[in-house]
Design a protein with these regions (language model features):
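Short acidic-glycine-tyrosine-enriched beta hairpin
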Residues: 89-107
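Structural motif
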Residues: 82-84, 109, 118
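Short histidine-centered beta-strand/loop micro-motifs
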Residues: 28, 62-70, 87, 94, ...
Length: 139
């Protein structure tokens, strides 16, 4: 009889190590103001989960624009710096600094209003690949 742990291990993930190598950060179309380092989680989980280390390329030059993500789970952990968000339906901005963890509800429209030039975050999503959809201007 196969244990539940063995079945889960075989079905869900593989060992992957993503070393912090020079040149590991790449720019993506999604946010040209940031560069991303793929942490190998998508490959290890067959695309079920994605994890990226994101960092700002420079200072914020203005709000990023209202948008939402077509995914089931979205977590952002602030490693360094500060970011200011605005969510649809909220009457105040949320300022998150190093050590803060944000779990965004699926389909929730939001806007990144400002961030520091040294901003670095860990982003975890389910699934790894998802669409980002522009939302109507909610300001």
């Amino acid at each position: 009889m196969t244990s539940d742990v063995t079945r889960l291990k075989d079905a869900f993930s593989q060992l992957r190590i993503a070393a912090a190598e020079p040149g590991a950060f790449k720019r993506r179309e999604l946010w040209s103001a940031f560069e991303y380092r793929d942490l190998g989680v998508a490959a290890a989980t067959g695309g079920r989960i994605g994890a990226f280390h994101m960092r700002a390329i420079g200072p914020c030059t203005g709000a990023q624009g209202w948008h939402w993500h077509a995914l089931g789970f979205h977590m952002v952990y602030i490693l360094k710096g500060r970011v200011t968000y605005r969510w649809e339906g909220s009457d105040r901005d949320v300022v998150a600094e190093a050590g803060a963890c944000l779990v965004q509800p699926p389909g929730g429209a939001h806007n990144v209003i400002d961030y520091t030039a040294d901003l670095e975050v860990l982003e975890i999503t389910m699934p790894a690949d998802y669409a980002t959809i522009p939302a109507a201007d909610l300001d």
